[in-house]
A protein has these predicted regions:
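Core segments of cupin and vicinal oxygen chelate
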Residues: 1-51, 74-81, 89-100
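Eukaryotic phosphotyrosine signaling hubs
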Residues: 8, 60-64
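Short hydrophobic/aromatic beta-strand micro-patches
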Residues: 14, 66-70
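Conserved donor-binding loop and adjoining core beta-sheet/short helix segment
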Residues: 55
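Short, charged/polar surface micro-motifs in flexible loops or helix N-caps
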Residues: 58-59, 72-74
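Short, low-order "capping/linker" segments at domain edges
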Residues: 100-112
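Short beta->alpha transition motifs characteristic of CBS
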Residues: 115-119
Length: 119
C-alpha cells in the first residue's frame, strides 16, 4: 500500500490544574502575542494552532500529538496495515457525517496520537 500524506498538526497539553493552564496561556501570550491565542469550549490554541492547551485534561498521559492527513480513510488503512490499532470509539464526525478525527488505541511514549482532516 502506498503511504498517504501525513503532516504534523499540533501537540495537546493536558491541564494539570486551572492555575497551571492559566500560566501556560499567559506564557504563550508572552511568546506569540495575545492576538494569536484562540479559545474554544475545550481548549486554548496558540502558535498558529500548533499548540492546544486542554481545559480539564485530555487523552494521553503526557498529552496528545495530532497529524493532519487529506485522506483519512487511506491513512487509517495504512496505519492498520502497519500494525497500529485505531480506537473507533474516539472517532469524531463533521455535520455531514464524514469522519474528521480518530485516535490510535494505544499511546506512544505517553502521548495519545490522533489523525485529523482539519489543518
Amino acid at each position: 500500500m502506498e503511504k498517504p500524506e501525513f503532516y504534523f498538526s499540533h501537540v495537546g497539553i493536558n491541564e494539570g490544574s486551572p492555575k497551571e493552564t492559566e500560566e501556560m496561556v499567559k506564557f504563550c501570550r508572552l511568546l506569540f502575542g495575545a492576538g494569536d491565542i484562540q479559545e474554544s469550549a475545550h481548549a486554548y490554541f496558540a502558535g498558529d494552532r500548533t499548540m492546544e492547551i486542554q481545559k480539564g485534561g485530555g487523552r494521553g498521559r503526557n498529552g496528545h500529538v495530532a497529524f493532519y492527513t487529506p485522506d483519512l480513510k487511506a491513512a487509517m488503512a495504512y496505519l492498520e496495515e502497519c500494525g497500529y490499532e485505531l480506537d473507533a470509539s474516539s472517532a469524531k464526525y463533521e455535520e455531514d457525517g464524514t469522519m474528521r478525527l480518530i485516535y490510535l488505541k494505544d499511546e506512544i511514549n505517553g502521548f495519545a496520537v490522533h489523525l485529523t482532516t482539519r489543518k
